[in-house]
Amino acid sequence: MSEGESQTVVSSGSDPKVESSSLAPGLTSVSPPVTSTTSAASPEEEEESEDESEILEESPCGRWQKRREEVNQRNVPGIDSAYLAMDTEEGVEVVWNEVQFSERKNYKLQEEKVRAVFDNLIQLEHLNIVKFHKYWADVKENKARVIFITEYMSSGSLKQFLKKTKKNHKTMNEKAWKRWCTQILSALSYLHSCDPPIIHGNLTCDTIFIQHNGLIKIGSVAPDTINNHVKTCREEQKNLHFFAPEYGEVTNVTTAVDIYSFGMCALEMAVLEIQGNGESSYVPQEAISSAIQLLEDSLQREFIQKCLQSEPARRPTARELLFHPALFEVPSLKLLAAHCIVGHQHMIPENALEEITKNMDTSAVLAEIPAGPGREPVQTLYSQSPALELDKFLEDVRNGIYPLTAFGLPRPQQPQQEEVTSPVVPPSVKTPTPEPAEVETRKVVLMQCNIESVEEGVKHHLTLLLKLEDKLNRHLSCDLMPNESIPDLAAELVQLGFISEADQSRLTSLLEETLNKFNFTRNSTLNTATVTVSS
């Protein structure tokens, strides 16, 4: 949802320029003035650089801090301005995005739609989709804005990478093309499996990001779906060829528009660039047909042509494309084993691989595939799988570079509106009373509870380790009285925002089990009890 280009907003006495937006009714585009870069840094510029980290604003919960440095969002329609921000809980940079409403009444008319769309976006959890963290509304007397926090992508876009590759007179590696297509389709299949399906609607090589390790992430997942649940901005002529023919002709477009856009991305990835029509950058149909004919692989050509069918109903789904012969390969035992290890990594010590392999005979047989009569078995030696290479491969699998597509793909958790409190908060006057804790929505994947004796018969000490799904660890401790109510303690942790309401019953069971184990063992030589559970 963001690019790795940034610039500093300069404070001035003049008002920012306000332009009308062609997106949702009531939205305005605020374009603050920005600095231009010069070769020699003046004292004023040095001072501006020092001010980049200045905190301009904080989120209501205090976790997100907006900085002065603006992030370039030229390819993300619907976002009026975006700034670098700091996640004070994780200690990482994020993007502070703002959507402006020209009048407060325009926001009020769309408030429920805004909540529904953004509640859905927060639920999205996929390694190949830029993470959407949080949102809230800032409603004032005569205007309103919606602010949402997204993952900061410091890497460049796929378009930039393809341009560099062509400039260096290189061709696209077929394995890389397959790997990228698989990651993009895995993300699209995830979005399209939502109920109702989430249509990206703005998929181009400019809104796909590639990291240094080859990980692909699609960004700008429709913040302006508050209007039609799809992106409708077709301002930039250079990207018009990414939009399906039915755009603008039908009221309700389907997920097939994303398949058409993906097909165009796949073609551009294969040929590096589709030549436009002179300076206008407009890409005519003839140029697209010529680019397809340049493809030497007939399977690759057929794959792309299926995506670019003019009739939406004839285009395959993202799931079907993952099984097309141009992409699909039976997953190797190595890949299956890696996914199994990654899925149970909380049960495996960090240095387990190194400990297991350091004393092994590298000439020994690691695995063997038996063969028929008269044929030699196929053997894999330990020397063919060095520990460092395995560590790198496991890290790539963990990051989402090699998704498993032959099995059920991850499905999004559907938000339950009656249970999940909307993060939109109304404006309030600051008072000395403490604000209520932020509601926790992340799932706990690992819980560990330890109880030890402090004063015999008077009190015990409880320590709780919680590992959340985004790898955040919480370490909590308190004194536990003999007559303490375990359900009340679990409910208090929910109220304070340490765990989600969905994990309350699991935590209650863990606390009760640990306490029972402690009571059973404290008469022996042991004065402590520990229980661990994982989801």
UniProtKB/Swiss-Prot annotation:
Pfam families: Pkinase. InterPro entries: Kinase-like_dom_sf, Prot_kinase_dom, WNK_Ser-Thr_kinase. One of its GO terms (biological process) is endoplasmic reticulum to Golgi vesicle-mediated transport. This is Nuclear receptor-binding protein. Residues 43-57 have a biased composition (Acidic residues). The gene is Nrbp1. Belongs to the protein kinase superfamily. Ser/Thr protein kinase family. Keywords: Acetylation, Cell projection, Cytoplasm, Membrane, Phosphoprotein. The modification N-acetylserine is found at S2. SUPFAM superfamilies: Protein kinase-like (PK-like). Required for embryonic development. Plays a role in intestinal epithelial cell fate and proliferation, thereby involved in the architectural development of the intestine potentially via the regulation of Wnt-responsive genes. May play a role in subcellular trafficking between the endoplasmic reticulum and Golgi apparatus through interactions with the Rho-type GTPases. CDD domains: PK_NRBP1. The lineage of its organism: Eukaryota, Metazoa, Chordata, Craniata, Vertebrata. Homodimer. Binds to MLF1, recruiting a serine kinase which phosphorylates both itself and MLF1. Phosphorylated MLF1 binds to YWHAZ and is retained in the cytoplasm. Interacts with ELOC/TCEB1, ELOB/TCEB2, TSC22D2 and TSC22D4. Interacts with the Elongin BC E3 ubiquitin ligase complex via its interaction with ELOB/TCEB2 and ELOC/TCEB1. Interacts with SALL4. Disruption phenotype: Embryonic lethality by 7.5 dpc. It comes from the Eukaryota. Residues 1-23 have a biased composition (Polar residues). The keyword Repressor does not apply. The modification Phosphothreonine is found at T431, T433. The modification Phosphoserine is found at S2. May act as a tumor suppressor to decrease tumor incidence and improve survival. Expressed in Paneth, enteroendocrine and precursor goblet cell lineages in the intestine. The protein kinase domain is predicted to be catalytically inactive. Signal peptide: none annotated. Residues 1-70, 409-437 are annotated as: Disordered. Residues 27-42, 414-432 have a biased composition (Low complexity). One of its GO terms (cellular component) is perinuclear region of cytoplasm. It is found in: Cytoplasm, Cell cortex; Endomembrane system; Cell projection, Lamellipodium.
